[in-house]
Swiss-Prot record:
GO terms of molecular function: rRNA binding; structural constituent of ribosome
Source species: Francisella tularensis subsp. tularensis (strain SCHU S4 / Schu 4)
Gene field: rplX
NCBIfam families attached to this UniProt entry: rplX_bact
Pfam families: KOW, ribosomal_L24
Annotated protein name in UniProt: Large ribosomal subunit protein uL24
Length: 105
């Protein structure tokens, strides 16, 4: 179950960008892939297409990473953390499992 939301500060826990932080921009494939700002940047070679006005060159592009390779970043502990749900004033909120602080303020 993916407990991330758009705008969450996450840290990469596996892969070539391990240890880097970024903000969740969007989700793909039903939430199993996460597009994180500044993470998993690849270079794509573009062929020219004069009919469409596209020039050739190399473009840097962000690709999504698997949701299992990122974890939410806890600013209090400065580490990756797990998220749980609980009810506060009859409202369902997310909290960090390590210290019990609320994620959504």
């Amino acid at each position: 179950m993916n407990r991330l939301k758009k705008g969450d500060d996450v840290i990469v826990i596996a892969g070539k960008d391990k240890g880097r932080r970024g903000v969740v921009k969007s989700f793909a494939k039903g939430g199993s892939l996460v597009l994180v700002e500044g993470i998993n940047i690849v270079k794509k070679h573009i062929k020219p297409n004069p009919n469409r006005g596209i020039e050739d060159g190399v473009v840097e592009k962000e690709l999504p990473v698997d949701a299992s390779n990122v974890a939410i970043f806890n600013p209090a502990t400065e580490k990756a953390d797990r998220v749980g749900y609980k009810f506060v004033d009859e409202k369902k909120v997310r909290y960090f499992k390590s210290n019990g602080e609320l994620v959504d303020l």
